[in-house]
């Protein structure tokens, strides 16, 4: 893991995160023009950082937030489509991979709300991963939720997963990506004040807990409704920050992520190898007791057992100590039911 140079090497993936200014758009034509601006940014960053292999833009950076529901439907995209063609061509032209936000992606059933989607485009201009946000930021966001994570071979073989904004507040999604083999988890977010300190802290903790690189791209600026705090960052698999932007609009951070180092750590680290130890619980004591050398593999957590085997029951259980309705009468949001 290296930070401070503009290069990369056969073993290191050059990753840049962009503090992109949150746009405020209303039409498809404006979205397409913004796509062309993102393409220009890619070209400029590649010129300045010749080692760049992967560039990452925040959630909502392509469309902005459509606060008008009709505009949200009118600007929703198909994948592939005109918008992705512009972004893919920029990746191909500059020989870089890119992560881009599409808010939203048309639902398969026309009347249902769109998805909040990320795409990973390779340096040939091909879409190699499409991820739909599993945990939309309720009660404000009205995206239809996705239902799974993905892992693909990224630049130089580094294994990459994508997650979006509020997803990252749930340890389960990080662990799911890591346990599927992800070595770099990309979190694109359009996170606003007041939760700045919490969001800076959680990505470091999740990198440490899952022994993985984390790259965060967050929006900056004010869109007339929310103020976005930026702080796009790149975190090492040991939880240390390699590079972090401030609140500046269109700031960029860059680091080189070693493929060999993370694989070496996952193979040879012992006391802090959380991924291995979770599925080999207590192996030292089990071995000393003459019960084999693999530890205990079974899941000890009652909540997860219930969730998998009886999701409705798990939902009822959490409602007992939270609330039974999605809405809150003391602070209603939209037309969400409060009873």
UniProtKB/Swiss-Prot annotation:
PANTHER family (UniProt xref): ALIPHATIC AMIDASE (PTHR43674:SF14), NITRILASE C965.09-RELATED (PTHR43674)
Pfam families: CN_hydrolase
Protein origin, superkingdom: Bacteria
Physiological role: Catalyzes the hydrolysis of short-chain aliphatic amides to their corresponding organic acids with release of ammonia.
Database matches in InterPro entries: Aliph_Amidase/BUP, Aliphatic_amidase, C-N_Hydrolase, C-N_Hydrolase_sf
Transmembrane segments: none
Active site: 59, 133, 165
Segments forming a coiled coil: none
Domain CN hydrolase: start-end pairs: 13-259
EC supergroup of this enzyme: hydrolase
Cysteines joined through disulfide linkages: none
Keywords of this entry: Hydrolase
Gene: amiE
Protein name: Aliphatic amidase
EC number: 3.5.1.4
HAMAP family: Aliphatic_amidase (MF_01242)
GO molecular function, one term: amidase activity
């Amino acid at each position: 893991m290296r930070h401070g140079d503009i290069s990369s090497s056969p073993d290191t993936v050059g990753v840049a995160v962009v503090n992109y200014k949150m746009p405020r758009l209303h039409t498809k034509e404006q979205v397409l023009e913004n796509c062309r601006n993102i393409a220009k940014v890619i070209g400029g960053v590649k010129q300045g950082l010749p080692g760049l292999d992967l560039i990452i833009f925040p959630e909502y950076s392509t469309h902005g937030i459509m606060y008008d529901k009709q505009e949200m439907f009118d600007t929703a995209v198909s994948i592939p489509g005109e918008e992705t063609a512009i972004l893919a061509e920029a990746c191909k032209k500059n020989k870089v991979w890119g992560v881009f936000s599409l808010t939203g992606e048309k639902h398969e059933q026309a009347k249902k709300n769109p998805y909040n989607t990320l795409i990973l485009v390779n340096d040939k201009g091909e879409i190699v991963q499409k991820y739909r946000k599993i945990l939309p930021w309720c009660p404000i966001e009205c995206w239809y939720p996705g239902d799974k994570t993905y892992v693909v071979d990224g630049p130089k073989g580094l294994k990459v997963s994508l997650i979006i904004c509020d997803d990252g507040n749930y340890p389960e999604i990080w662990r799911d990506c890591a346990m599927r083999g992800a070595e770099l988890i990309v979190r694109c977010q359009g996170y606003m004040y007041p939760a700045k300190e919490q969001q800076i802290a959680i990505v470091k903790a999740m990198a440490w807990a899952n022994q993985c690189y984390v790259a965060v791209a967050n929006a900056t600026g004010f869109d007339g409704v929310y103020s976005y705090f930026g702080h796009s960052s790149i975190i090492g698999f040991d939880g240390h920050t390699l590079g972090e932007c401030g609140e500046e609009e269109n700031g960029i951070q860059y680091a080189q992520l070693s493929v060999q180092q993370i694989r070496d750590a996952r193979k040879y680290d012992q006391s802090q190898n959380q991924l291995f130890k979770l599925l080999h619980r207590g192996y030292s004591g089990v071995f000393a007791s003459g019960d084999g050398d693999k530890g205990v593999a079974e899941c000890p957590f009652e909540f997860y057992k219930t969730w998998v085997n009886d999701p409705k029951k798990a939902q009822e259980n959490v409602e007992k100590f939270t609330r039974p309705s999605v809405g809150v009468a003391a602070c209603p949001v939209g037309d969400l039911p409060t009873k």
